[in-house]
Amino acid sequence: MTNDALFPVDSETGWVSGLRQLPSPNCDARPEGAQVEVIVLHGISLPAGQFGGDAVIRLFLNQLDINAHPSFLPLKELQVSAHFLIRRDGEIFQFVPVSMRAWHAGISSCLGRSAVNDFSIGVELEGTDTNPYEEAQYRSLARLNQSLIREFPAVTADHLFGHSDIAPDRKSDPGPCFDWPRCRRDAVLLS
């Protein structure tokens, strides 16, 4: 597979080939008849502003040591996940099959509907609102988005949203440093 090749999505299992797969317990079945229509982009770092550790992965696997950092204490009972995490170096992890509902959006609305987890795929980018995202992340995100757009016809470049778009009173990620024009342009350039 070349660097620009799409990731094969197994429509039976929901797993994407070529990615590191770490199954999260923080997911469940989508409601009957629900189809993927949007991709929601998030920004995350644990501790805030620190990159490269395994805390985000541990959070999504319910293995975070809350005593490892004072900022982790409020996360003690939190059960969250996303379908994907893109690290600063562009490595992509998959936690939840795309056929399942990951617990990433929280209280939110999109396309005039609530319960966004029902019809979305969540992609976490390792980062913060105030730090520009890395070139490697944009390249990996472009390949992933195009692979998902090819798999799910209802998803288009116009159906890429930030967490801040679907929960504006609660969330600000992926933040003002995220290059939305590039993201949308790259999502269609690879097709």
What is each of the regions a protein language model found here?
Residues 41, 123, 141:
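Conserved, mostly hydrophobic/aromatic
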Residues 85, 122-124:
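Conserved beta-strand segments that form the floor/walls of ligand-binding pockets within enzyme
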